[in-house]
């Protein structure tokens, strides 16, 4: 912290001055010595021999200047790095002090009790919860400062590597042995990358690499995770094939040859994956300059695009190469995408889009390239395309652009795509084939479409896929492109004939998560009372109301696709729960003093949507083909999903964090779920819980409970009087009439009359 970093800039000035002096000496030598052998007064063998020696000396003067300038540049680079890191460390120390911490000269963090008031100090001594919160805070600050100190150490090691390398004469043909370095470079990261490449290449070749060298490779990845020069220099040296072979070797070591150091090898994969992510960044957005557009081609043709173009061309070549055996193949793309899954960095949208296109082209050219033959390769997921889609889900904007049915770019730069159609309807999804002595047994991959489901959820919502325990909020803002994706999903999943919309089991929950975030729109569509949705359903599939984008699909298509999603009870529960929350919020938005008509319209619409849900629920239960669930199990799973976390949800967890809501806003749905939860039996008693679910999912009971909770909070309805009770009964009746309308309409869409 007290080191005088100005010494680095002073030294840099000195080396720059030395380069200038060497330049003067070069000119003098060239004029007064080297020139003698070039004239006509000295001829013959001795002149030729002298000329060769003079040439070497002249080159050494030139190389010495190059080396001196490079050292000066490295010193300035080191100064910039150390000054930045020291500034961050000082800022962290000051932040810790501001948070009532002490930081010693050795970087040890402790709680500064001397700054506390006497009452606070007393509370700290006697309150275990207070003490635990302090311990957590101390650990947090200690971790932050330790990491910053480690960053300084990492940077210092990188500087050491650069200064050791810059003075090495790498040209064996310049006439000297260990002379000045005419190839010296003034960038620390380039030397770190070259050193890392040398270690990585030996590792990829299966050669001996020491523990110290592995630690150095890990440090280089860690220290340069955000440096494009390092990333591109390293990957240019390794090339796609070297990167693939290195991945395979790291997997072999982690899962087979050296299992006790598995964590280290996986961490190295993470560093390599982060390097790929940084090196393949493309300026701008795929929505503006999509693959194949003139704007993208112009960038590729420039200096900045040269690395990317060469890398992608070579990846295309080696991605389709088999690095395994004929009976147990392992294709380059499979290894490369599995490597990408280790990254903690968001991949560029253009890179993901192009790689997705390349993977589709590869499997169209060579069928079954992504199938699994025999035992799974450790650390490798055979279906590289589905694996890439899972990675894409972590960049929702990239996923939206990849699936947008309208394509990307504008004017002459517009490029369409059919990814949604291909992946939902046309692709023959890879299977798992296991050879036996008498036959080959082929089964479906149990993880098939997991990546697709995550990517579609991200694409249609603009958010990361929801995790277990997270609820979709029923009214989220969406872009036009996201609404087009959601509309496109429904269009691709709707049945071409009959009433069945078969949805793969691994797509049901993620698509329900996505659709539930359009509940404000599905509520209107199922309610059947807004002409805007009817008009837009057969047009663009969305419409705008001011700054708000709305999804529009036909009522029939929506009901049939929701029926397909509802084969999974959790998916059905997700949709029903979101709808219940939206109805509750809509009821709360009815102004006090509203007329009966102003109240009955939204309540009738609410009833119609619940009627559609009733028809869908009955359709699933009465389907003899219902796979994997008995009727009782299906209903019980719905129950546990809906009541779980629904009671007084003061903060609804979402993909982006959480949305805080008031207790009163969801009081109706909370009361309903709370009563339901109190009625539930032990989880193993599925038949009993199924009967309870029937009672609470019955629209009469659900809406009566929600309306009662809503009415009790209103000043314009006195539910203790006969008049108030009559008004509540009339409103409940409006809902139930709407329920019959919605149920009858949905049943019509779910009844196959072709037989």
What does each model-found stretch correspond to?
Residues 1-172, 208, 745-755:
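N-terminal secretion-targeting helices of virulence/extracellular proteins
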Residues 650-659:
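Transmembrane helix interruption/hinge and helix-loop junction motifs
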Residues 40-43, 47, 68-71, 127, ...:
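Alpha-helical rod/repeat scaffolding segments in eukaryotic adaptors/tethers
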Residues 172-651, 665-749:
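Non-catalytic all-alpha helical scaffold/repeat segments
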């Amino acid at each position: 912290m007290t080191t005088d970093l100005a010494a680095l800039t002073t030294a840099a000035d000195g080396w720059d001055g030395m380069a200038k002096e060497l330049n003067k000496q070069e000119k003098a030598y060239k004029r007064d010595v080297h020139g003698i052998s070039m004239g006509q007064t000295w001829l013959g063998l001795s002149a030729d021999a002298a000329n060769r020696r003079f040439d070497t000396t002249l080159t050494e003067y030139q190389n010495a200047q190059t080396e001196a300038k490079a050292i000066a540049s490295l010193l300035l680079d080191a100064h910039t790095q150390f000054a930045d890191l020291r500034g961050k460390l000082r800022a962290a120390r000051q932040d810790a002090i501001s948070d009532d911490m002490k930081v010693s000269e050795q970087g040890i963090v402790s709680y500064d009790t001397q700054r506390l008031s006497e009452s606070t100090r007393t509370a700290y001594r006697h309150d275990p919860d207070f003490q635990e919160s302090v311990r957590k805070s101390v650990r947090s600050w200690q971790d932050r400062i330790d990491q910053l100190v480690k960053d300084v150490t990492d940077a210092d090691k990188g500087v050491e590597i650069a200064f050791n390398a810059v003075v090495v004469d790498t040209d064996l043909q310049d006439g000297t042995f260990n002379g000045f370095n005419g190839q010296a470079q003034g960038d620390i990261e380039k030397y770190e990358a070259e050193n890392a490449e040398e270690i990585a290449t030996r590792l990829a070749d299966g050669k001996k690499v020491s523990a110290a060298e592995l630690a150095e490779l890990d440090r280089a990845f860690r220290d340069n995770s955000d440096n494009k020069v390092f990333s591109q220099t390293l990957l240019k040296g390794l090339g796609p094939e070297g990167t693939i072979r290195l991945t395979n070797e790291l997997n072999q070591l982690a899962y087979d040859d050296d299992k006790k150091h598995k964590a280290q090898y996986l961490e190295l994969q993470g560093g390599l994956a982060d390097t790929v992510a940084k090196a393949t960044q493309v300026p701008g957005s795929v929505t503006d300059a999509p693959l194949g557009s003139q704007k993208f081609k112009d960038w590729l043709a420039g200096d900045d695009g040269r690395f990317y173009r060469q890398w992608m061309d070579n990846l295309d070549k080696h991605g389709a190469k088999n690095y395994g055996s004929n009976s147990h193949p392992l294709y380059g793309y499979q290894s490369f995408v599995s490597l990408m899954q280790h990254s903690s960095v968001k991949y560029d949208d253009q890179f993901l889009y192009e790689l997705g296109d390349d993977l589709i082209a590869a499997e169209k050219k060579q069928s079954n390239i992504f199938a699994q033959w025999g035992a799974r390769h450790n650390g490798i997921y055979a279906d590289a395309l589905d694996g890439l889609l899972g990675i894409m889900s972590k960049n929702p904007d990239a996923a939206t652009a990849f699936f947008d049915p309208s394509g990307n770019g504008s004017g002459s730069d517009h490029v369409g795509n059919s990814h949604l159609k291909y992946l939902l309807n046309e692709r023959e999804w890879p299977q798992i084939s296991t050879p036996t002595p008498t036959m080959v047994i082929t089964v479906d991959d149990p993880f098939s479409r997991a990546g697709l489901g995550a990517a579609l959820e991200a694409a249609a919502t603009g958010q990361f896929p929801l995790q277990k325990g997270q609820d979709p909020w029923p009214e989220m803002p969406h872009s036009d492109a996201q609404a087009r994706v959601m509309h496109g999903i429904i269009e691709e999943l709707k049945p071409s004939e009959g009433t069945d919309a078969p949805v793969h089991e691994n797509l049901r929950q993620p698509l329900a998560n996505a659709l539930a975030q359009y509940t404000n729109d599905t509520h209107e569509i199922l309610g059947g009372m807004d002409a805007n949705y009817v008009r837009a359903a057969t047009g663009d599939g969305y419409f705008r109301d001011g700054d708000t984008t709305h999804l529009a699909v036909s009522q029939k298509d929506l009901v049939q696709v929701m029926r397909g999603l509802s084969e999974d009870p959790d998916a059905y529960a997700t949709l029903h729960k979101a709808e219940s929350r939206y109805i509750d919020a809509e009821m709360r938005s009815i102004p006090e003093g509203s007329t009966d008509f102003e109240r009955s319209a939204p309540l009738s619409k609410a009833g119609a949507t619940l009627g559609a849900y009733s028809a869908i629920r009955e359709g699933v239960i009465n389907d003899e083909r219902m796979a994997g669930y008995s009727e009782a199990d299906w209903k019980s799973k719905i129950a546990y999903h809906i009541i779980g976390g629904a009671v007084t949800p003061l903060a609804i967890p979402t993909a982006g964090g959480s949305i805080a809501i008031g207790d009163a806003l969801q009081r109706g749905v909370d009361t309903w779920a709370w009563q339901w939860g109190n009625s539930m039996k032990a989880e193993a008693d599925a038949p009993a819980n199924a009967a309870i679910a029937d009672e609470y999912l019955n629209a009469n009971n659900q809406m009566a409970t929600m309306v009662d909770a809503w009415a009790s909070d209103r000043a314009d309805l006195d539910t203790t009087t006969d008049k108030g009770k009559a008004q509540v009964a009339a409103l409940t009746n409006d809902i139930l009439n709407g329920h019959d309308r919605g149920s009858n309409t949905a049943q019509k869409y779910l009844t196959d009359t072709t037989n």
